[in-house]
């Protein structure tokens, strides 16, 4: 049952969820993690720690590491001629984002908990004659500003509508020509406190209008106003002499949070201000957590406005707006600190900047230090990307002193060419979290990551969470050298990517890491210098000593066998040069059960179990059971289903002659990448208070061939290595930083000139 107030879309269940959330915060208990549409409503909780949440980004990428047909039309398996499966998940979760290339592949099947929902767009009926101003269908379920089609994005159909599922989710394409896409979804440790229970999408209820109204405010001041909830605002004016630095604002003595940071400059100084350096330091840490060129931090590679647009960037957290005389740059990402904050600007060589207006809106921080996190913007310059190696935007193990960090990756702003060369955009995003050797996030291209398709048609666009704000269609059409600077941005809110130990963010440059374009990148992330996911045990299957140590029993397991293969790290050979060689490992496979014992942290909030496996076996599925080894007689409790769809053999279908309506093809492609890491989340009620657990894996085969009528697949459960990670509260209080600042709250601001 739901009740709507006309024109506002508030439901009883929405109000109840917010009351539940507020009550938890008021009681002093750990706050609930915002999920579903609450992730937008509660956007002020962007910095909060997401313990027990995992994000995954799956796609139609070329399994061989290349760029075949621009990473399109590679399917996990084909359930039927009009059911070409690209995503198959078992267990509760939320799909937060999907991206398709135009209408290709539509109608799309969203099979949720056994119910098939058809999603399509207005060009589906006659794809040979696409419809301008197209929309998703059903239109009311996929409205702007949470869904856009190629008419707005210049090449892609995008949806940020949360799609919940309680048991299973399967996505399939009805047509296969140019069927490309990537999808971001979250899984949760059962027992994690959420703002609302996960409920299956019903295919009938539109997103609430309060959320649509909120996201529609992108490009405006969305932060709490001064005077509300203790918010204050300081402002001033400064000059920035060439090659010199100026402190803009400082605050010390008590925990706080910046909710809005704004600069404005005369239009005739905009190009020079692009390269001014913005630095922000939290709690007197030795290095600034934000250290980036000003324009790139605010979402654009350069403050060059070819078409005299009002907005270069009209996103939800960042805005670059022009009026008749000035350029206004605004950031609304929440920025907590626990003792002090300092904002600085560093000038550029050969140019004096003056008449810089600034303002900072800030207020008290009420969250405990280990439940929040610092904002970071890590800048990297890549003038000559190395052939065969991804461009690395971030490795948290090597920033700000290194070590363990816990938080979430929330986006990028990056220049991908200084010469209007769009071909480098064929490169795929690859993101690795918490020691994984398999990317938890693997995309299909760089402009896809930036919300476009087909290089945005060379056009500029700006949306709440993705955009291509600057850059000409080609070097030949560029009006100046500044017009050749190409940049894109992508922000993650509901679809952010948590990590508990480390994050490695990479972009392939060109379709096979061969581009020589000059990249400059900013990776946005929240993080504390302490782990929330700690490695407590590791067990190597096939190693006699490790098997004895972990009480491994598997009556039907194969003898240990050696595998020589690779992980999915892009092309292994480029221009005749081997980029990364194969490696060897040992493991077993079983069609029965395996049992073993693992050590965990008794203060855990749940456990993540990672398995290294041989991905040559299709659709590996097993029941997972957990028992307390300290008990006299094992009492097994079911932890869930561990399912990994697909294998290193995929089905490729790309009808010839660009035939949109061509029949589905069944071309099997097997890659040389058999190694894969996969993850399973064990409910906290089965692990809390225990220092050891016994795990039972029972193989449950999925008798589905790669395509209807195809040969019977090779089925087994592969196990090479198991690693246990325990979720814990980060050991961080903020006190060490607070001791280095005065005990009385004090704010310093730059003097007006």
Range-by-range predicted roles:
Residues 14-16, 22, 747:
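Ala/Thr-enriched low-complexity intrinsically disordered regions
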Residues 175, 198-202, 492, 496-573, ...:
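TerminUS-proximal long segments
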Residues 131-166, 306-332, 336, 447-498, ...:
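Beta-strand-rich ligand-recognition modules
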Residues 18-28, 487:
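Hydrophobic h-region of N-terminal signal peptides that target proteins for export
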Residues 2-15:
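Bacterial N-terminal signal peptides that target proteins for export
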Residues 29-558, 562, 591, 613:
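Beta-strand-centric surfaces of beta-sandwich/beta-rich domains
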Residues 1-3, 25-31, 742-753:
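Basic/polar N-terminal segments that are highly enriched at the extreme N-terminus
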């Amino acid at each position: 049952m739901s009740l709507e107030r006309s024109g506002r879309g508030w439901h009883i269940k929405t109000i109840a969820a917010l009351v539940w959330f507020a009550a938890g915060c008021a009681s002093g208990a750990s706050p609930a993690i915002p999920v579903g549409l609450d992730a937008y409503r509660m956007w002020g909780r962007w910095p909060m720690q997401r313990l027990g949440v995992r994000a995954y980004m799956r796609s139609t990428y070329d399994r061989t590491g290349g760029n075949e047909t621009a990473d399109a039309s590679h399917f996990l398996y084909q359930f039927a001629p009009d059911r070409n499966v690209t995503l198959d998940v078992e267990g509760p979760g939320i799909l937060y984002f999907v991206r398709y290339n135009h209408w290709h592949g539509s109608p799309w099947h969203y099979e949720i908990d056994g119910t098939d929902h058809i999603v399509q767009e207005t060009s589906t009926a006659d794809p040979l004659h696409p419809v301008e101003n197209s929309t998703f269908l059903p239109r009311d379920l996929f409205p702007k500003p949470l869904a856009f089609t190629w008419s707005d994005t210049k090449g892609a159909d995008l949806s940020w509508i949360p799609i919940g599922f309680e048991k299973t989710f399967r996505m399939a394409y009805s047509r296969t020509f140019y069927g490309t896409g990537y999808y971001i979804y979250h899984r949760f440790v059962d027992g994690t406190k959420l703002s609302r229970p996960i409920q299956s999408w019903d295919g009938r209820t539109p997103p609430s209008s309060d959320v649509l109204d909120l996201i529609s405010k992108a490009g405006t001041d969305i932060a709490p106003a001064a005077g509300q909830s203790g918010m204050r605002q300081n402002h001033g004016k400064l000059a920035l002499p060439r090659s010199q630095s100026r402190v803009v604002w400082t605050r010390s003595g008590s925990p706080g949070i910046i909710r809005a940071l704004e600069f404005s400059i005369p239009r005739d100084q905009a190009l020079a201000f692009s390269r001014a350096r913005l630095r922000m330091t939290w709690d007197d840490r030795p290095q600034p957590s934000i250290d980036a060129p000003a324009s790139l931090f605010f979402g654009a590679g350069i403050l060059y406005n070819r078409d005299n647009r009002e907005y270069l960037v009209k996103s939800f957290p960042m805005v670059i707006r022009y009026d008749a005389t000035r350029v206004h740059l605004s950031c609304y990402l929440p920025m907590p600190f626990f003792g002090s904050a300092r904002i600085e600007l560093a000038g550029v060589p050969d140019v004096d900047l003056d008449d810089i207006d600034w303002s900072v809106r800030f207020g008290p921080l009420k969250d405990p230090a280990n439940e929040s996190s610092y904002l970071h913007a890590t800048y990297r310059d890549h003038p000559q990307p190395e052939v065969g190696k991804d461009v690395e935007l971030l490795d948290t193990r090597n920033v700000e002193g290194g070590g363990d960090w816990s938080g979430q990756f929330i986006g990028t702003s990056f220049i991908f060419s200084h010469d209007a060369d769009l071909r480098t955009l064929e490169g795929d995003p690859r993101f690795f979290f918490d020691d994984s050797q398999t990317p938890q996030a693997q995309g299909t291209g760089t402009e896809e990551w930036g919300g476009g398709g087909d290089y945005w048609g060379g056009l500029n666009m700006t949306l709440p969470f993705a955009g291509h704000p600057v850059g000409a269609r080609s070097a030949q059409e560029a009006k100046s050298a500044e017009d050749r600077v190409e940049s894109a941005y992508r922000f993650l809110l509901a679809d952010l990517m948590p990590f508990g130990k480390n994050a490695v963010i990479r972009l392939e440059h060109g379709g096979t890491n061969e581009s020589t374009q000059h990249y400059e990148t900013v990776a946005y992330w929240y993080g504390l210098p302490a782990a929330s996911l700690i490695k407590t045990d590791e067990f190597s299957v096939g190693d006699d000593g490790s098997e004895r140590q972990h009480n491994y029993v598997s009556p039907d397991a194969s003898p240990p066998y050696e595998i020589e293969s690779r992980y999915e790290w892009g092309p292994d050979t480029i221009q005749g040069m081997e980029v990364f060689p194969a490696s060897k490992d040992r493991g077993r496979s079983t069609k029965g059960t395996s049992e073993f014992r693992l050590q965990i942290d008794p203060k855990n909030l749940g456990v993540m179990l990672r398995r290294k496996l041989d991905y040559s076996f299709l659709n590996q599925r097993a029941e997972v059971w957990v028992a307390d080894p300290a008990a006299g007689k094992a009492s097994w409790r079911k932890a869930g289903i561990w399912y990994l769809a697909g294998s290193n053999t995929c089905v490729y279908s790309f009808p010839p002659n660009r035939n949109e309506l061509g029949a589905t093809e069944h071309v099997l492609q097997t890659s040389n990448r058999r190694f894969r890491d996969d993850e399973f989340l064990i409910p906290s009620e089965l692990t809390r208070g225990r220092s050891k657990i016994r795990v039972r894996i029972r193989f449950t085969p999925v008798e589905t061939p790669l395509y209807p009528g195809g040969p019977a697949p090779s089925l087994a459960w592969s196990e090479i290595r198991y690693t246990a990670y325990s979720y814990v509260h980060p050991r961080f209080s903020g006190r060490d930083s607070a001791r280095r600042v005065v005990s009385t709250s004090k704010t310093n601001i730059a003097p007006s000139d």
